[in-house]
Amino acid sequence: MLELIYKMQPLDYVYLLVGIILFIFAIQSFLNKDHKYRIGTGLFWLLYSVSFIFGSYLSKEINGWLVIAMAAIVLVKQLGKGHYFESPIEFKKGEAVRIGNIIFIPALLVGIITFIIGFFTKLGALVGLGIAAIIAMGAALYITKGSFNQGFHEGRRLIDAIGWTAILSQLLAALGYLFNLAGVGKIISSAVASVVPADNVFLVVVAYCIGMVIFTMIMGNAFAAFAMITSAIGVPMLVVAHGANPAAIGAIAMLAGYCGTLMTPMAANFNIVPVALLEMRDQYGVIKAQLPIALIMLVLNILLMYYFI
């Protein structure tokens, strides 16, 4: 076991740390007797922790079954919120006044330290994020005079509020990989070519931008959509056929994809997680607020791309 730890890469240590934290959340859920869904919730986070700690050593089939088991827990509605030993509202208000704006220092440290490590070292941004999170945690404990135990309870409260959407980013990344293996890009290219006249630049631009929006909404990730839609429409039908500037249309296509991000629950980190953290009544309140701006920006992106052709 120790030999395996010594051979681990820096990023593996970050995954190990995340897995240990998720394991602690699982144990806390199992021990929370006031939690109506403590077995299902604890099992969900336990399976998730296993994927982080042992995922590299397990077969693809076993990792796949772990995901299916987690999905089954959500399907039968056994994932829910519990009791988190929160401080009284009066105490929170008093601490907010006492600490003031200094409370934002840990959050700022995460971004600053991640940037420094990612930009000036060879460790990479993800490793930098892990190191930054540890330092920020220490700063938060020093500023608030809280305890590690309290920190884990708050962490569990937040992860339970986020719920199943916490695993959505990984699932969407896998979906993008499967789409590429299945040759979806070629299918899209053939379908668009059969409907949109190749000599009509404006219609090709519309197809490119709307394609970015639709696939971003499906996959929840503009980067994954970009690889497929650009190889299917952007490169052959705009760059090759009409001599478009690849840098310009690529940048604008990403902006069009972000319009899709504003309109989909699949972009959970942006549109669903804030709803859970802010305890909004309308599950799609964030999306509804962003929808008009997204549509306006989409039209502007189409016109801007057409201008650069």
Please describe what each predicted stretch is.
Residues W164, Y177-V184, T216-I229, C259-A268:
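Short helix-coil transition sites and intra-membrane helix breaks within transmembrane domains
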Residues V196-P236:
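Hydrophobic alpha-helical transmembrane segments of multi-pass integral membrane proteins
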Residues V201-F202, H242-G250, E279-P292:
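Membrane-interface alpha-helices at helix entry/exit sites of multi-pass transporters
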Residues A224-M237, A267-E279:
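Re-entrant/interfacial helical elements at transmembrane boundaries that shape
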